[in-house]
């Protein structure tokens, strides 16, 4: 198993990022795969790093067009983000995207679907919770100090804080192999080496803003009935109750329970790609 640093170097050489400005927001993105296929849009988790999806690109680009992008720092709220995404998709002629959203990216997918319910081709939600009233209430309790933490993040010595943030990321390890633990450690070390304070402030602001959203309801997802895949680890950051509430929101979802924790999206990417390919094949039947 190659380490993250080695893999991301090869990936960025094979798939260089491009930049485009849409309505004042700069999108850093990779667009690859079948030009005449359905478009899979990958929505990043809490570090807003498109590199988290690198193992998914070659594994899925032969059957679909794939779009990866970082959330633009000009878009400061989740409502601004989904409106900006909509304009971004229109620029490239992307219609009815199938969202693959992990962790907080799964929540962004729900907000987008709530706003544009008839313009979503499917939902693949991984290691995430629902944007329902119960989950938002639980998250508000869990993150009641988020405004204070955000204030501190803007003013702290960020370089000195990085080791603590890496340790926090590694706290999501759950019974992974020694090889997987080493990969995760190298991933966080590599990402944080050049990670900018402004980027962390931006994504942390988006995470805090999740608590300000209007809760979604089951009716928001009626238009994607039968086009929903949920991949739920049994030792995830999101509790079993949150997973149950997510399931209740969805219409006729396919549910795949997997062994692992919150980092399984990256550490078990090959297994997840196979699951996604099977689901896409079933959707096409």
Question: Which ranges hold each PLM region?
Answer:
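Conserved loop-alpha-helix segment in the C-terminal half of the alpha/beta-hydrolase fold
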Residues: 58-59, 223-260
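Short glycine-enriched nucleophile-adjacent loop
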Residues: 106-117, 123
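Active-site loop/oxyanion-hole signature of alpha/beta-hydrolase fold enzymes
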Residues: 67-104
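Alpha/beta-hydrolase fold catalytic core
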Residues: 1-38, 63-64, 95, 281-285
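Conserved HGGG/HGGXW glycine-rich cap/lid loop of the alpha/beta-hydrolase fold
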Residues: 25-75
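Conserved alpha/beta-hydrolase catalytic His-Asp/Glu region
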Residues: 134-136, 156-222
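Flexible "cap/lid" loop of the alpha/beta hydrolase fold
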Residues: 114, 123-155
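Catalytic histidine-centered segment of alpha/beta-hydrolase-like enzymes
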Residues: 260-273
């Amino acid at each position: 198993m190659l380490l993250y640093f080695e893999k991301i170097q090869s990936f960025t050489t094979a798939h260089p990022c491009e930049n485009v400005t849409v309505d004042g927001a700069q999108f850093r993105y990779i667009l690859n795969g079948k030009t005449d296929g359905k478009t899979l849009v990958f929505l990043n988790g809490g570090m807003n790093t498109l590199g988290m999806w690198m193992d998914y690109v070659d594994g899925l680009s032969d059957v679909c067009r794939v779009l990866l992008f970082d959330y633009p720092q000009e878009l400061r709220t989740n409502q601004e983000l989904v409106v900006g995404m909509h304009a971004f998709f229109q620029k490239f002629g992307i219609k009815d995207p199938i969202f693959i959203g992990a962790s907080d990216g799964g929540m962004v997918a729900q907000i987008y679907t709530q706003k544009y319910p008839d313009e979503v081709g499917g939902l693949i939600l991984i290691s995430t919770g629902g944007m329902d009233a119960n989950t938002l209430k639980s998250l508000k309790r869990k993150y009641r100090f988020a405004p204070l933490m955000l204030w501190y993040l803007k003013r702290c010595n960020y370089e000195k804080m990085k080791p603590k943030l890496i340790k926090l990321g590694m706290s999501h390890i759950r019974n992974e192999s020694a090889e997987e633990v080493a990969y995760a450690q190298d991933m966080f070390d590599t990402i944080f080496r050049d990670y900018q304070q402004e980027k962390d402030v931006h994504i942390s602001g988006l995470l805090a803003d999740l608590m300000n959203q209007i809760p979604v309801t089951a009716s928001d997802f009626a238009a994607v009935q039968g086009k929903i895949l949920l991949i739920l680890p049994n030792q995830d950051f999101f509790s079993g109750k949150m997973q149950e509430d997510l399931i209740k929101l969805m219409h006729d979802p396919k549910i795949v329970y997997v062994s692992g924790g919150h980092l399984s999206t990256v550490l078990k990417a090959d297994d997840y790609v196979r699951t996604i390919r099977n689901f896409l094949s079933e959707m096409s039947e």
